Amino acid sequence: MATEYALRMGDGKRVFLAREKIMEEIEAGTANAADLGEIPALSADEMNKLAEILMMPGKAVSVEHGMEIPVTHDIGTIRLDGDQGNSGVGIPSSRLVGCMMHERAFGADTMELGHIDYSFKPVKPVVANECQAMEVCQQNMIIPLFYGAMPNMGLYYTPDGPFENPGDLMKAFKIQEAWDSMEHAAEHLTRDTIWIMQKLFASGADGVNFDTTAAAGDGDFYGTLHAIEALRKEFPEMYIEAGMAGEMVLGMHGNLQYDGVTLAGLWPHQQAPLVAKAGANVFGPVVNTNTSKTSPWNLARAVTFIKEAVKVSSLPCHVDMGMGVGGIPMLETPPIDAVTRASKAMVEIAGVDGIOIGVGDPLGMPISHIMASGMTGMRAAGDLVARMQFSKNMKIKEAKEYVAKKLNVEIRDLADEYIMRELREELNIGVITSVPGSAKGIAAKMNIEKLLGIKINSCELFRKQTGK
């Protein structure tokens, strides 16, 4: 009897498959992506490697030494203090505690602050509160800290917003009116996002994470691209990550263009050049998980799409890998076996420059991804590599080479806790455990500025406030 391997369905349910069936599923998944995206399927060697990853005997797997990548985040501290019946675990804690827990306890390379609603529009009335929270976090933290939110253009339609719902208008065959409503909503989305980030950047934010971009279709993508363009023009040093909502941009409008390209129907490898053109530093491509398909099918399909996006993108690609995307099951407590296998496959086969950790409980998301493929932040040199990706648009190989040269170490040493612990203390760039008298917060980041030859926004704010 053929050996069967314990894998997952797209909803997280356990399923047992023989190697022959696993290969059939991988071939079908990569063929589906190749057909839809008109891109190359995985090679025979890549499919065999993916099968080997899926069939590894351990519950958790990880990338090979030296292949670690930085991680970014979606939903910020909500996975800790959130309690809405989704993936939040309802721990009563401040956002400062949540951010520092990711930095000091989870080994995150970057982190983000976000509003409990996690959309830009609701931030407007409480932006002063968000600015104060950002300042306090920046004074205490060392890793890059973004402000994260969803463009969420749907909030601009009735009953939540001022413009009539285009879905209702279309049902009434008022097509032009529906188009007008989407265009007006996109303009307001752009305006609000710029205004909010002007305030947050003035309060020391390293940058912005546009999460779930294009959730409301091509109008949402259109408004976000124009917001990125305006922010880049006003703030050349701002870190900007653009993470998508789905694998294909839905044509809710159908006629909107950016840089002469129609936005409706774009796949990840077609979205990447537009995100770069707008002025982002990092692109977060997405591939949806099909809950009725197996993990070999879903992961092969996701890796195929993302591999092509990485290939054509001039920007570093941090693939979005929360529950329900990136080959990961759609489950609030994502299975560790599935998460770590998807994480390893994206790094070793798709060649991603980083991973955007999405929705899921703390153990199933940040802890699993960081254990599988992360650089472990301040435990090693993950925060430094991430800063070079966002400061200079460096892909993973270039960023690692740059940081290794500055530290006078081998590339493989960048994720070595033993080597980096002593080196970080010697250079006074912040250590993960408490050392009396060592640089912390702004002081450590000022030393990182000198080491890497970059500017850090919270340090610029400190100098402005002190006149030094």
Curated annotation (Swiss-Prot):
Protein keywords: Methanogenesis, Methyltransferase, Pyrrolysine, Transferase
Top-rank taxon: Archaea
Pathway where this protein functions: One-carbon metabolism; methanogenesis from dimethylamine
InterPro entries assigned to the protein according to its UniProt record, in alphabetical order: Dimeth_MeTrfase_MtbB
One GO process term, biological-process aspect: methylation
Assigned EC number: 2.1.1.249
Molecular function as annotated in GO: dimethylamine methyltransferase activity
Reaction(s) this enzyme catalyzes, per UniProt: Co(I)-[dimethylamine-specific corrinoid protein] + dimethylamine + H(+) = methyl-Co(III)-[dimethylamine-specific corrinoid protein] + methylamine
Keyword set includes Ion transport: no
Signal peptide span: none
Protein family (similarity comment): Belongs to the dimethylamine methyltransferase family.
Primary role: Catalyzes the transfer of a methyl group from dimethylamine to the corrinoid cofactor of MtbC.
Protein name: Dimethylamine methyltransferase MtbB1
Organism listed in the record: Methanosarcina mazei (strain ATCC BAA-159 / DSM 3647 / Goe1 / Go1 / JCM 11833 / OCM 88) (Methanosarcina frisia)
Name of encoding gene: mtbB1
